[in-house]
Amino acid sequence: MSEDFKLDATARNDLGKGASRRLRRLADQVPAIIYGGSKAPVNVSVSHNELLKHLQHEAFFSHVIDLNIDGTSESVILKDVQRHPSKAQVLHLDFLRVDKNTKLHKQVPLHFINEATSVGVKTQGGKVVHNLTQLDVTCLPQDLPEFIEVDLAAIEAGQILHISDLKLPKGVISTDLTKGADHDLAVVTILKAKGGESEEAAE
């Protein structure tokens, strides 16, 4: 993990929909809840402006966050973000506590590289189809990757890459593959050019 994310939070006792609306409107704060582990859930609020800065980084969604709650630090991951349907406004956050000795499950984005220069596209005129854009992984918090790279340089038209074909970082495993071979999903396909086009991979 190459980035460190820190976010300040304030514990709150004034709960309910009305309190949350006032918090967002008058204090420019976002209501949130922290849960998980052996501790009781805690209701907090965070700065909306500060949060928006972090949300601009893809890694914020797949990274352990240092959440400072009134001077007490908690290691958490972002589990859910509720956004306003028409405004650039975050309505609520869910944070999950993590323990450095306990494995966690998290979706990590896939980064596809060398698409345009791959054998299947540049030489054979194929078309890339992304079957997955994120991968469910299981690992310790300190091993959680910001993203997983998928190199298409040597992939030919008509070829399908599955989860089992990916090179995962040390300490990281695919959650799907732990369920059996039937869950070895297609990740990316290069369709053949028209006239010799292959079928898209089914999950």
Curated annotation (Swiss-Prot):
Query: Could you tell me which CDD domains the record lists for this protein?
Result: Ribosomal_L25_TL5_CTC
- Please name the InterPro entries in this protein's record: Rbsml_bL25/Gln-tRNA_synth_N, Ribosomal_bL25/Gln-tRNA_synth, Ribosomal_bL25_b-dom, Ribosomal_bL25_C, Ribosomal_bL25_long, Ribosomal_bL25_short, Ribosomal_L25_dom, Ribosomal_uL5_bac-type
Among the GO biological process terms of this entry, one is:
translation
Give the Gene3D superfamilies listed for this entry. Answer: Ribosomal protein L25, beta domain, Ribosomal Protein L25, Chain P
Keyword Cytoplasm included in the entry's annotation: no
Recall the GO molecular function terms of this protein's record.
5S rRNA binding; structural constituent of ribosome
| A GO cellular component entry from the record | cytosolic large ribosomal subunit
Top-rank lineage group of the source organism: Bacteria
Keywords for the protein's UniProt record, in alphabetical order: Ribonucleoprotein, Ribosomal protein, RNA-binding, rRNA-binding
SUPFAM superfamilies recorded: Ribosomal protein L25-like (SSF50715)
Q: What does this protein do?
A: This is one of the proteins that binds to the 5S RNA in the ribosome where it forms part of the central protuberance.
Quaternary structure per UniProt?
A: Part of the 50S ribosomal subunit; part of the 5S rRNA/L5/L18/L25 subcomplex. Contacts the 5S rRNA. Binds to the 5S rRNA independently of L5 and L18.
Family statement: Belongs to the bacterial ribosomal protein bL25 family. CTC subfamily.
Protein's name in the database: Large ribosomal subunit protein bL25
Source organism lineage? Bacteria, Pseudomonadati, Pseudomonadota, Gammaproteobacteria, Cellvibrionales
**What gene is this protein translated from?**
rplY
